[in-house]
C-alpha cells in the first residue's frame, strides 16, 4: 500500500519554526503541450493555514475557506488551463502557516483555525503521471525568512488579525514564480505519509468549499490627501508627482538620503491587497500605515492593569487632513534594490488590508529610489446586489450607498464585525448582517456557513461561542439567542426544513442553559458579568453609560439582567415556531409553556413605575429585577416578546426614546428598536433616528460607524440598517410565511412623496411602486413572481 500522500512540507521545518507565523514558498516546473492548452486542467489544493496559487506569475486564487472547526478541512479546485503556456510552466504556491502553539499574543490569528501539522496539499486530477503536479511527485520549497509576520502594535489589547509584516528584502526571491528562476538552492519537499498528518486534514476529511471564491479587482488610489514635513513648493511638486504615479502616468524619483511622507486616499473605504513597485533604491525603508480616516489623538490614560493605555481618538470630518492625523496599523518594507523600470521589484503583503487612507513614510539610503507604482487589488465576498429602491429623499439614497458598501466590506470568508480591527464573526453582528444580505441579494451561502460555524461551536453547557470560527473560547450568553434568530430568519426567507432539523438540538441546548439558571422568582439569574471579571461576558449593547456593555445593575443586587430574561423569552418563542414548521408539536408546546412562565415571571418582578419630570407616572420594564434603572432596550424587547400590547409599547417607547434619562441604543441595537416601533405603529417616528446616519454623511464617511458612542471603527455592518429598512419597511416588502411563499406589501412612507423599486427574493423579483397622483392620492403598482401569494389586499392600504 502506498502510504505517501499529496500532503507535502519543507523537510528542514523546525520546532522553532512551528511557534512562529511563517511564509513558505513552493514551486514546480511542468510541461504543457497544445492539447493541454485546449482542455481544463484541474487541481485540488489546500493548506494549513492559507495558500495563494499562481501559474507563470499570474494569481489564480487563494484559500482554503476558513475551517469551521478542527473536524473537517476545506479543499478547493482550481483550473490552471487559462494561465498555461505551450512548453515549460511554473505552478507556485505561497503558504502562510500560523502556529498551532500559542506564545503570548504575538503569533495568533483568532479566526483562523489550524492543526498541529503544517502542510500544502496538491492533487492533479489530470491523470497523466508524467505531467502531473501532484504533491507527492516532488516540489521545490523554501522558507522566506525575509518576512516577519507581526501584530497590530496594540500594547493595551489583543491583536486578533496578526498579519502585519516587517520585511527586509533581498533579490533572493525575485521572480520566483516565473520560469527561469534558479531554485537549485531550494529543498525538495517531503510527502507526508498517512501516519504523519493530522487526522483533521487526512484525505478523507477534506471537504469541498461551501462558499464562492472571493472577488479580486485591480483598483487605483484616487488622490493625494497630504504631504507631510515639506515646504510649500516641495509639497506642491510632490503632490503632483505622486498623483501622476497613482494614476499610472509616471514614476516618483526620491533622492538618496531623503525622507518623504505622503498620504494617499482611495475613493472610499476598501479591503484590498496593496501592491508596490520599485526600481533601484537599495536599503530604502517604506513604512506603511493603513487608516480608516483622519482623527484627533487623545492623551493616554492609566490602565486598571497598570501602566498607560491609548484611548480611542476623537473623530469629526473624516477627510480633515489639515487638523487630523492618520492612525492605524503599520507594516515595514526595506527595498532590495534589484528592480528596473522594465522589471520592477514588487511587494504585496500576504493578508489584505483595510483602509481609506494610506500613509507612506519613505526613507532612502545611499541611492535614489524610483517609486513606479502603488495600487491595490480589492477583495471580499462576491456580493451581487439584486434589490434597488428609489425614494424622494436623497439622504436615504446616500445612506443606502454607504450601508451597502459597509456590508460588502464586512463580508469575506465569514461575516466580520469590523475588517479593520478584529475580522471576527460574532453572533449578534452576523444575525442582522445576514438579514441585510437576504434583503438585498437573496444569497444565503455565506449565511449557511455562519450558522454552521456557530452550531459546531456549542459547548457542553449548551452555550455557543460568541464568535466562530475562533481559536479561543468566549461566551456572551445573549449571543446564543441571536443564533436562534438566525435560524428563524432563514426559515422565513428560504424555508429549509433540513437545516432547521440540523440546528434544533443546539437550539434546545441553548434554551436548556437558560432554563438551568432561573432564579426562584422565575427570571434568568446572573449568568455573566463584565469582561475579564466573570466567566461569561454579559454584553448587551455599547449604549452610552454602559461602560461594560451592560447596565450598572449587572453589578448590583442579584446581578440579573432583565434583557437576558427577555432574550430567553424571545428565543423560546422563535424556537416554538421553528418546531412547528418541522412538525414537532410536542417540542413547540414545551417551548411555549416555558415562554408563558417566563412572561409571568418578568411581569411580576421586572416592572417598575417611573416618575417623569412633569409628574406623570409611566410603567416601564426595569433593567434588572427590582432595580430602578431603565433603558430603551428593555422597552423595545417588551414589545418584541409581547410582554405589552402595542398601545402600551407605544407609550413606553415614546416616553424613553430620545429621553436622556434613559439609556439609548447605539446603532448596534437600532434594528430591534425599529422592529418595536413597527409593531407599535409608530414607524414614521423612525425618521428622526436616521439622523445618526445623516451625521455620518455630514462627517464625510463612506461606510457606517461601529457605534455612535466612541466611534472606534468606521466600518461595521450591524450599522447597515437601511439595507433592511428600505426594501422591507419603507417599500414594504416582507415574507410572512416560511420560504417567502407569502408576502406582505405594507409601505411606511412617512414624509416621503414616492418610493419604488425591485426586491430580490429566493422566489424571484418583486417590483413595487408607490406614488402620489395629481389628485394627491397614493397609488400602487406591483408585480410578484409565480407561486408567491400576497397576504394582504394592497388596494385597501391607506397611505397617509
Show the residue positions of the predicted features.
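Alpha-helical support elements that line or immediately flank enzyme active sites
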Residues: 273-292, 358-363, 427-457, 487-494, ...
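Heptad-repeat amphipathic alpha-helical coiled-coil interaction surface used
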Residues: 484, 491, 569, 573-576, ...
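Active-site acid/base region of carbohydrate-active enzymes
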Residues: 132-141, 357, 365-402, 408, ...
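Solvent-exposed loop and edge beta-strand segments that line ligand/cofactor-binding
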Residues: 263-266, 348-349, 414-427, 468-480, ...
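Non-catalytic C-terminal accessory modules of carbohydrate-active enzymes
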Residues: 151-175, 593, 600, 687-800
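Extracellular/oxidizing-compartment recognition motifs
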Residues: 1-417, 429, 445-446, 450, ...
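Catalytic-core region of carbohydrate-active enzymes that cleave or remodel glycosidic bonds
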Residues: 668-699
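Alpha-helical repeat scaffolds
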Residues: 648-657, 686-689
Amino acid at each position: 500500500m502506498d502510504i505517501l500522500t499529496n500532503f507535502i512540507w519543507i523537510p528542514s521545518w523546525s520546532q522553532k519554526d512551528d511557534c512562529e507565523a511563517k511564509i513558505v514558498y513552493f514551486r514546480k516546473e511542468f510541461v504543457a503541450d497544445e492539447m493541454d492548452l485546449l482542455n481544463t486542467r484541474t487541481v485540488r489544493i489546500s493548506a494549513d493555514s492559507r495558500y495563494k496559487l499562481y501559474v507563470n506569475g499570474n494569481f489564480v486564487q487563494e484559500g482554503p475557506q476558513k475551517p469551521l472547526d478542527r473536524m473537517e478541512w476545506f479543499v478547493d479546485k482550481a483550473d490552471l488551463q487559462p494561465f498555461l503556456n505551450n512548453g515549460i510552466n511554473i505552478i507556485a504556491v505561497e503558504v502562510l502557516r500560523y502556529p498551532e502553539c500559542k506564545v503570548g499574543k504575538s503569533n495568533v490569528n483568532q479566526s483562523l483555525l489550524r492543526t498541529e501539522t503544517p502542510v500544502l496539499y496538491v492533487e492533479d486530477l489530470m491523470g497523466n503521471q508524467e505531467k502531473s503536479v501532484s504533491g507527492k511527485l516532488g516540489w521545490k520549497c523554501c522558507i522566506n525568512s525575509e518576512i516577519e509576520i507581526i501584530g497590530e502594535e496594540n500594547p493595551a489589547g489583543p491583536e486578533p488579525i496578526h498579519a502585519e509584516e516587517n520585511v527586509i528584502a533581498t533579490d533572493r526571491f525575485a521572480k520566483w514564480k516565473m520560469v527561469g528562476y534558479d531554485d537549485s538552492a531550494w529543498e525538495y519537499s517531503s510527502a507526508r505519509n498517512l501516519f504523519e498528518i493530522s487526522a483533521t486534514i487526512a484525505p478523507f476529511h477534506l471537504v469541498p468549499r461551501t462558499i464562492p471564491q472571493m472577488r479580486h479587482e485591480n483598483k487605483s488610489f484616487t488622490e493625494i490627501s497630504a504631504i507631510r514635513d515639506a515646504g510649500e513648493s516641495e509639497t506642491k511638486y510632490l503632490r503632483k508627482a505622486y498623483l501622476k504615479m497613482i494614476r499610472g502616468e509616471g514614476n516618483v524619483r526620491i533622492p538618496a538620503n531623503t525622507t518623504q511622507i505622503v498620504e494617499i486616499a482611495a475613493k472610499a473605504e476598501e479591503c484590498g491587497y496593496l501592491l508596490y513597485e520599485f526600481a533601484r533604491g537599495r536599503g530604502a525603508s517604506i513604512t506603511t500605515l493603513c487608516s480608516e480616516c483622519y482623527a484627533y489623538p487623545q492623551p493616554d490614560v492609566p490602565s486598571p492593569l497598570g501602566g498607560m493605555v491609548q484611548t480611542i481618538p476623537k473623530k469629526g470630518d473624516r477627510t480633515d487632513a489639515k487638523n487630523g492625523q492618520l492612525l492605524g496599523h503599520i507594516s515595514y518594507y526595506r527595498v532590495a534594490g534589484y528592480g528596473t523600470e522594465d522589471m520592477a521589484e514588487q511587494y504585496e503583503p500576504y493578508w489584505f488590508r483595510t483602509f481609506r487612507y494610506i500613509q507612506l513614510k519613505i526613507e532612502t539610503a545611499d541611492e535614489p529610489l524610483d517609486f513606479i507604482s502603488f495600487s491595490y487589488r480589492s477583495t471580499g465576498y462576491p456580493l451581487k446586489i439584486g434589490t434597488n429602491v428609489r425614494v424622494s429623499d436623497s439622504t436615504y439614497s446616500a445612506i443606502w450607498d454607504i450601508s451597502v458598501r459597509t456590508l460588502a466590506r464586512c463580508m469575506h470568508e465569514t461575516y466580520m464585525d469590523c475588517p479593520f480591527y478584529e475580522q471576527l464573526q460574532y453572533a449578534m453582528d452576523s444575525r442582522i448582517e445576514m438579514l441585510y444580505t437576504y434583503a438585498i441579494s437573496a444569497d444565503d451561502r455565506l449565511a449557511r456557513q455562519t450558522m454552521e460555524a456557530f452550531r459546531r461551536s456549542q459547548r457542553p453547557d449548551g452555550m455557543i461561542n460568541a464568535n466562530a470560527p475562533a481559536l479561543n473560547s468566549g461566551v456572551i450568553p445573549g449571543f446564543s439567542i441571536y443564533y436562534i434568530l438566525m435560524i428563524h430568519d432563514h426559515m422565513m426567507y428560504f424555508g429549509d426544513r433540513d437545516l432547521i432539523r440540523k440546528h434544533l438540538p443546539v437550539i434546545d441546548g441553548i434554551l436548556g442553559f437558560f432554563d438551568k439558571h432561573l432564579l426562584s422568582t422565575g427570571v434568568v439569574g446572573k449568568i455573566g458579568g463584565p469582561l475579564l471579571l466573570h466567566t461569561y461576558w454579559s454584553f448587551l449593547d455599547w449604549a452610552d453609560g454602559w461602560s461594560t456593555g451592560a447596565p450598572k445593575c449587572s453589578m448590583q443586587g442579584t446581578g440579573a439582567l432583565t434583557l437576558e430574561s427577555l432574550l430567553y423569552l424571545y428565543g423560546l418563542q422563535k424556537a416554538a415556531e421553528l418546531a412547528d414548521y418541522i412538525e414537532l408539536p410536542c417540542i413547540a408546546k414545551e417551548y411555549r409553556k416555558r415562554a408563558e412562565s417566563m412572561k409571568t415571571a418578568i411581569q411580576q418582578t421586572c416592572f417598575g413605575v417611573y416618575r417623569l419630570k412633569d409628574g406623570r407616572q409611566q410603567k416601564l420594564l426595569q433593567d434588572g429585577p427590582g432595580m430602578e434603572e431603565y433603558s430603551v432596550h428593555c422597552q423595545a424587547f417588551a414589545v418584541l416578546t409581547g410582554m405589552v400590547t402595542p398601545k402600551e409599547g407605544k407609550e413606553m417607547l415614546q416616553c424613553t426614546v430620545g429621553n436622556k434619562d434613559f439609556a439609548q441604543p447605539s446603532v448596534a441595537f437600532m434594528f430591534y428598536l425599529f422592529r418595536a416601533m413597527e409593531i407599535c405603529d409608530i414607524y414614521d417616528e423612525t425618521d428622526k433616528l436616521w439622523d445618526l446616519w445623516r451625521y455620518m454623511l455630514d462627517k464625510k464617511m463612506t461606510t457606517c460607524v461601529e457605534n455612535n458612542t466612541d466611534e472606534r471603527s468606521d466600518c461595521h455592518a450591524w450599522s447597515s440598517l437601511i439595507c433592511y429598512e428600505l426594501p422591507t419597511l419603507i417599500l414594504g416588502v416582507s415574507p410572512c410565511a416560511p420560504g417567502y411563499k407569502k408576502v406582505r406589501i405594507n409601505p411606511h412612507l412617512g414624509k416621503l412623496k414616492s418610493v419604488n423599486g425591485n426586491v430580490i427574493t429566493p422566489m424571484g423579483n418583486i417590483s413595487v411602486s408607490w406614488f402620489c397622483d395629481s389628485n394627491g392620492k397614493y397609488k400602487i403598482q406591483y408585480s410578484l413572481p409565480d407561486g408567491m401569494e400576497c397576504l394582504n389586499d394592497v388596494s385597501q392600504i391607506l397611505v397617509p
